[in-house]
């Protein structure tokens, strides 16, 4: 560091500088033109109002029950093109969604109590779920099967048990 830079050191510093400029330009371009971002809308809501919407949704479209982590939850199948609701509350994703492959849905996600992380595995879709906000993502399932929802934001003692499910069936 106390001697003048040699030819190799100047070359590597130039490469590093050009790479930094390239990445600085590419980050915003990739954000807008890449296909990796989940298209979302966000609305203010109250936990009570959102809970009422979820309960009305479950009451209208329940088709059965399933067990997740020893808890019986309703399985809800809304018609394609409709709004579907999922609620995060202390250590539970509610209800279990049943969707059709190849059909578009507007998925509403909110929390009633704490900040949670919505992680749909193995697809690896990740969203932060915060009380007071209704996050709406337009989704189209591309493969059939059972997918697991994991909370990836520590939400206190029962965090490790916060698992939900999305069932995607073949088109009718």
Regions found by a protein language model. Name each.
Residues 1-85:
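Extracytoplasmic entry segments of secretory-pathway proteins
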Residues 2, 6, 120-143:
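Extracytoplasmic beta-sandwich strand-turn segments characteristic of Greek-key/jelly-roll folds
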Residues 82-86, 108-133, 164:
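Histidine- and aromatic-enriched segments that form or immediately flank copper-ligand environments
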Residues 91-98:
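Short, charged beta-strand/loop "edge" motif centered at a coil->beta-strand transition
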Residues 102-103, 141-147:
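Short tyrosine-centred short linear motifs in exposed loops/low-complexity segments
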Residues 111-115, 143, 155:
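Short, charged beta-turn/beta-strand-edge "cap" motif at the junction between a beta-strand
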Residues 152-160:
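Short, exposed beta-strand-loop hairpins at the edges of beta-sheets
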Residues 166-170:
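Interdomain boundary/hinge segments at the C-termini of tandem beta-sandwich modules
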């Amino acid at each position: 560091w106390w001697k003048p830079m040699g030819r190799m050191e100047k070359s590597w510093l130039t490469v590093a500088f050009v790479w930094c400029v390239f990445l600085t330009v590419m980050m915003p371009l990739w954000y807008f033109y890449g296909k990796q971002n989940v298209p979302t809308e966000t609305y203010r809501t109250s936990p009570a109002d959102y809970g009422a919407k979820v309960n009305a949704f479950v009451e209208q479209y329940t088709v059965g029950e399933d067990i997740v982590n020893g808890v019986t939850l309703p399985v809800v199948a809304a018609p394609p093109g409709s709004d579907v609701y999922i609620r995060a509350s202390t250590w539970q994703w509610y209800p279990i969604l049943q969707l059709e492959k190849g059909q578009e849905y507007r998925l509403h996600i909110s929390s009633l109590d704490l900040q949670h992380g919505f992680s749909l595995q193995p697809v690896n879709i990740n969203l932060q779920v915060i009380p007071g906000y209704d996050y709406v993502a337009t989704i189209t399932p591309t493969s059939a099967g059972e997918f697991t929802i994991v909370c990836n934001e520590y939400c206190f003692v029962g965090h490790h048990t916060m698992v939900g499910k999305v069932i995607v069936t073949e088109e009718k």
